[in-house]
């Protein structure tokens, strides 16, 4: 069993959490997801189509189907209505992480080692807080980011601790698309080459 398999499960904590209303929503839905075999990726309020509450979820293996989205919606929607966390009309969006997914758990970094990612840190490292590069040398404490386009004077390799990250996501590349489709059969069935690959995210929208 490799490092990714050891920690890739429904109980694995996320590296960072939401604030404000998003945090309240997360606290409500997380206990509902685990018994169904899902885990939360993130909660985000978006100012599109009026107001959209995006709840991004996945199974422990990273998969999610349209039927899964429907199941999650039927489960969390009644509680959100009762708690009235958002005191105005909104659209509820249940979605999968997609190909250029957020990296929110250590297992995500192990799973996608060797791929390009964007990282934001809460502390300044080598004079910066935003980085772009290839994920390498993943450990339980952090990783090394190999810069793909280092500017003059910038380090080619940056060591980053997991405890210092406030945001991370994969960068869409041809290599990532090929790898993602190999790993996720559900994703390969959704993927339409002519469209933007980010459209391969499974999404269901509901008016509230």
Swiss-Prot record:
Subcellular location: Cytoplasm
Gene Ontology biological-process annotations: ribosomal small subunit assembly; translation
Keyword Cytoplasm: yes
A Pfam family per the record: RimP_N
Key words of the record: Cytoplasm, Ribosome biogenesis
InterPro entries xrefs: Ribosome_maturation_RimP, RimP_C, RimP_C_sf, RimP_N, RimP_N_sf
Gene Ontology CC, one term: cytosol
Chief site of localization: cytoplasm
Xref: CDD domains: YlxS_C
Function: Required for maturation of 30S ribosomal subunits.
Protein family membership: Belongs to the RimP family.
Protein name: Ribosome maturation factor RimP
């Amino acid at each position: 069993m490799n490092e990714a398999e050891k920690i890739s499960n429904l109980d694995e904590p996320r590296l960072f959490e939401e604030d404000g209303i998003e945090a309240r929503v997360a606290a409500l839905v997380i206990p509902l997801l685990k018994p169904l075999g899902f885990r939360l990726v993130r909660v985000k309020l978006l100012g599109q189509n009026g107001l959209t509450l995006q709840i991004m979820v996945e199974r422990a293996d990273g998969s999610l189907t349209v039927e899964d989205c429907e199941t999650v919606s039927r489960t969390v929607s009644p509680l959100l209505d009762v708690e009235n966390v958002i005191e105005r009309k909104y659209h509820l969006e249940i979605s999968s992480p997609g190909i250029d997914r957020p990296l929110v758990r250590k297992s995500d970094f192990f799973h996608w080692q060797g791929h390009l990612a964007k990282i934001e840190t809460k502390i300044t490292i080598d004079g910066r807080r935003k980085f772009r590069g290839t994920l390498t040398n993943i450990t339980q404490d952090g990783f090394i980011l190999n810069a793909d386009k280092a500017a003059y004077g910038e380090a080619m390799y940056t060591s980053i601790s997991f405890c210092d990250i406030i945001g991370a996501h994969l960068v869409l590349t041809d290599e990532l698309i090929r790898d993602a489709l190999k790993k996720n059969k559900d994703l390969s069935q959704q993927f339409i080459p002519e469209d933007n690959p980010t459209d391969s995210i499974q999404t269901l929208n509901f008016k509230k």
